[in-house]
Amino acid sequence: MQDTYLLALAEYLSGPDAGRGEVRFPQSRGRRGKMILAEAIAAFAEMNCGYDCAAMHKIVTDNGVDAFLVRRIARSRSWNRVRYMQLLSLTGARPSLLPRIKRLEDSPDAYVSLFALIIRISSAPEQTIAAVREFSGAMSHRVLSEIMLRLWRGFIPVAYEPMICSDNENLKLLGIYIIRFFGIEEAQNILYAQLDSPNGAVHDAAMYTLAIMKSSMTRKCVVQSVAGMSFFQRRRFYKFLAAEGYSTRSLSALQSAETDSRLGGYMESLVNSYKKMLG
């Protein structure tokens, strides 16, 4: 049955009349049928990008998939609740149901909290900044990666500057991840400015994003920032730079400023070993 639903979804969402009229799935009236339809919609969303989100939302609401999943979330616990929330994060939900989901953002369960935020963002992309600002939890790599997936599929508008210019640390992190994800070279100066951030997560995200984008490591702000790291933080960062393909010449400023001779030699040996590996 799921294959039949997937074919119907593909035809409706990719045809010239996408989003027009109603698409009903008569066999989805019962609980089992609703679940199969929810899984089919989620599978379609995972496998495709750039489709008409409004048309998909119409299918979800016309067939009561979002209301069904919200009821299952309320009645379930543990992994079953997370499973239903993951499905809802891909199908989206109508605005009237979102307050019931928002309450779950404060859950002690990290997965429940994560998907509560993702559901809000997927259901109302224009409210992404507000949703992230209101999120009380920390923006872990898992949370940011899930948001990036939705962004890649075209669910979320890209506007990194208002995020990074915000005083909210979670928004700053999301803005930095957007720059990293899309490799926005003209935003490098914004990243350099974030090296002065007192927040360790923002500072580290900016530093590693600069490295991923092959930015210059000779700037004074970079050298000073690295000098302020602990021994183990510097060691880990040097290893990352070597893996990213930096040469000893491009890292000369960092090597000259390195106060620990062990790390200076370690950096050079790492770069040389990676060169040998690449032939």
Give the residues covered by each predicted segment.
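Short amphipathic alpha-helical segments that mediate assembly, nucleic-acid/protein binding
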Residues: 6, 34-37, 53, 219, ...
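N-terminal topogenic membrane-targeting module
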Residues: 1-74
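Structured extramembrane domains adjacent to transmembrane segments
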Residues: 71, 75-90, 96-100, 109-114
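Membrane-interacting alpha-helical segments
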Residues: 38-41, 79-81, 232-233, 261
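Juxtamembrane/interfacial segments around transmembrane helices
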Residues: 18-26, 167-169, 257-260
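Amphipathic alpha-helical scaffolding segments comprising HEAT/armadillo-like alpha-solenoid repeats
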Residues: 53, 60-73, 94-105, 125-135, ...
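Structural detector for internal amphipathic alpha-helices that build alpha-solenoid repeat scaffolds
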Residues: 43-44, 50-60, 82-93, 113-123, ...
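Short inter-helical turns and helix N-cap capping residues of alpha-solenoid HEAT/ARM repeat scaffolds
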Residues: 76-77, 108-111, 136-141, 167-168, ...
